[in-house]
Amino acid sequence: MKDKIDYLSTLFVGIDIASRIHVISALDFNQEYFIKMKPVENTQEGAIPLEGMIADVLKENPQFKYVVIRMESTGFYGVHLANYLSASDLLAPFSVRVYCLNPKEVKNYKKSFNDI
């Protein structure tokens, strides 16, 4: 079991999974964006710069000690990316956690907010 993390020192990454292009955003607990709506290809070649974008934010912002990545579980489109990021040597020092979420639950959660 993993230890609890301090959310104030966590970079939160969201990835919208699609068949050809994924879209990534990253923000902190106070909702300050560090990556906003950046498209990346759904290929091995696209996963490398995506990993690099996250690693660059972590390098440039020493307040981050952890990274939490959330992505939609859309069949096989995101499986390889989830495995790649969870095994990343660049992200490993930040206790990376990758979660695949049910898209219906994400949609219903989003409906509970007026300003999203």
Where are these regions (language model features)?
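Phosphate- and other anionic-substrate recognition elements at nucleic-acid/protein interfaces
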Residues: 1-116
